[in-house]
Amino acid sequence: MSDASANGDATEGAAPAAAQLPKMQILGQFIRDLSFENAAVQYGTATQGQPDIQVQVALDARKRTVDNQYDVIMKLKIESKTKDEDAPKSIFLIELEYGGVFLIENIAEQQLHPFLMIECPRMLFPFVRRIISDMTRDGGYPPLNLDQIDFVALYRQQIAARQAQQPVGTA
């Protein structure tokens, strides 16, 4: 009998602590926009040697009308060009907007924006990497396996750029 009451007390004491733990759940994922332009095939661009590949990443997060739900969108622009110094020619261009719908609970308001812009993209990235890899392979190229993205550094760059755009000396 004493064991039951001890367990009951422990359970009651643990419930408020468990309720305060941060919670993230992916409710859904989707491709908003996808484009693969295979210029090498269209225009006969030679693809000899290692191409120059540029990857641009942008992130966006918006609150949905439902409580604690957010859309997080990862936008990638990947351009592959020949390494011809005189006039580099496009080999392929990929543009992808990939999104996730997230349920976020028990995150402090001041931590919510970094959480949405760092942790949520980390969850989406493996799926984005696979889409890019499959698309380049299906386009007739070796699969392009994107390197891991440092979302913390990307977030810091976005904050610094936003602060640089603000007028100096405003009070």
Swiss-Prot record:
Pfam families: SecB (PF02556). One of its GO terms (molecular function) is unfolded protein binding. GO terms for biological process: protein folding; protein tetramerization; protein transport. Its main location: cytoplasm. One of its GO terms (cellular component) is cytoplasm. The keyword Signal does not apply. Belongs to the SecB family. This is Protein-export protein SecB. It comes from Jannaschia sp. (strain CCS1). The lineage of its organism: Bacteria, Pseudomonadati, Pseudomonadota, Alphaproteobacteria, Rhodobacterales.
